[in-house]
């Protein structure tokens, strides 16, 4: 379907700096063939900003709202990594041992319209990768990266995230700076999802990030 109304023409707008919400990393699942609960452990950063390939499912996501040209917009960016249990013993470099997915969207609040796009690829070959050292995720032409900006700042202001997203009807080039400490969900980062102890994930968030950059809408 062709876009209509305010999204009919590709336009680029400067985002007014303001706080947004960020839930940066979650990891769920366990090693193949087990039903054990995830062990409680102290999360360590920046290592735990990165990927954990021994876990079955992992995700990094950003949600927020901005003002651009005096108009409100919402946005969502999510990257997933999924371990494929059945291919872990294969020796071929082409074996799809991990899959990366991504989904992104912009909400035109005034125009009451949602536009979105997605990507998927197997990890490797420079096409899709998720670093274990820190948040550095690439899926084709979409990226999400974290860098340390502590230089003389308090600990809670130590993170800067950047993302580059180009969809069929929109684009996002945004920078997010932390304004408060990491928030550990559940019991020091181990978040129960149900009555069974195995129904849990490691989960933390960084809310109230200050955001700046540009967004594009239209095709």
Feature map (PLM): residue ranges:
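Short, Gly/Pro- and small/polar-rich lid/capping loops
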Residues: 36-63
